[in-house]
């Protein structure tokens, strides 16, 4: 049962992957349309990607905690 709970906790990784993929596509599209805006777009993209990855890391930690039954 704990393996199922850990698997459900890791579903957040699916959402993170989709979200970062969409954000990367939109950032690339924006930079392609306005290359001079690279300095404004890229840092915001990195901050957003880092925040999204934090969710994935938290869900991984929760999954490990569930498996080890802490």
UniProtKB/Swiss-Prot annotation:
Residue intervals passing through the bilayer: 3-23, 44-64
GO CC annotation, single: plasma membrane
Membrane topology: Multi-pass membrane protein
Site for Reversibly protonated during proton transport, residues: 53
InterPro entries listed in its UniProt record: ATP_synth_csu_bac/chlpt, ATP_synth_F0_csu, ATP_synth_F0_csu_DDCD_BS, ATP_synth_F0_csu_sf, ATPase_proteolipid_c-like_dom, F/V-ATP_Csub_sf
Domain of life of the source: Bacteria
Localization, UniProt: Cell membrane
Short name of any one Pfam family annotated for the protein: ATP-synt_C
Gene Ontology MF terms in the entry: lipid binding; proton-transporting ATP synthase activity, rotational mechanism
Keyword entries, A-Z: ATP synthesis, Cell membrane, CF(0), Hydrogen ion transport, Ion transport, Lipid-binding, Membrane, Transmembrane, Transmembrane helix, Transport
Subunit structure: F-type ATPases have 2 components, F(1) - the catalytic core - and F(0) - the membrane proton channel. F(1) has five subunits: alpha(3), beta(3), gamma(1), delta(1), epsilon(1). F(0) has three main subunits: a(1), b(2) and c(10-14). The alpha and beta chains form an alternating ring which encloses part of the gamma chain. F(1) is attached to F(0) by a central stalk formed by the gamma and epsilon chains, while a peripheral stalk is formed by the delta and b chains.
Stated role: F(1)F(0) ATP synthase produces ATP from ADP in the presence of a proton or sodium gradient. F-type ATPases consist of two structural domains, F(1) containing the extramembraneous catalytic core and F(0) containing the membrane proton channel, linked together by a central stalk and a peripheral stalk. During catalysis, ATP synthesis in the catalytic domain of F(1) is coupled via a rotary mechanism of the central stalk subunits to proton translocation. Key component of the F(0) channel; it plays a direct role in translocation across the membrane. A homomeric c-ring of between 10-14 subunits forms the central stalk rotor element with the F(1) delta and epsilon subunits.
Family: Belongs to the ATPase C chain family.
Designated name of the protein: ATP synthase subunit c
Organism: Caldicellulosiruptor bescii (strain ATCC BAA-1888 / DSM 6725 / KCTC 15123 / Z-1320)
Gene this protein is translated from: atpE
């Amino acid at each position: 049962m704990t393996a199922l709970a850990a698997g459900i906790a890791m579903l957040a990784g699916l959402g993170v992957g989709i979200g970062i993929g969409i954000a990367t596509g939109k950032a690339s599209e924006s930079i392609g349309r306005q290359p001079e805006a690279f300095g404004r777009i890229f840092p915001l993209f990195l901050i957003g990607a880092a925040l999204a990855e934090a969710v994935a890391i938290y869900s991984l930690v929760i999954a490990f905690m569930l498996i080890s039954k802490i």
